[in-house]
Regions:
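C-terminal alpha-helical interaction appendages
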Residues: 1-57
Length: 57
């Protein structure tokens, strides 16, 4: 049986693709980077999800 596990990079790229549809790709990248700098323990995918949500609200 094949499982559908997508990599961290694929998840981040999906988030950035969605952000790009709002012309917010770079803003999400920058904000995610700031979140990870502020909290080095933060999961990379979670940082991108949080940044995306911050920009599209």
């Amino acid at each position: 049986m094949k499982t559908n596990i997508i990599s961290e990079e694929e998840q981040i790229e999906e988030i950035l693709t969605e952000a790009n549809s709002y012309n917010l790709r770079q803003e999400v990248i920058t904000t995610a980077s700031m979140f990870m700098q502020d909290d080095p323990e933060l999961d990379k995918v979670a940082a991108y999800q949080m940044a995306y949500m911050e920009w599209i609200k």
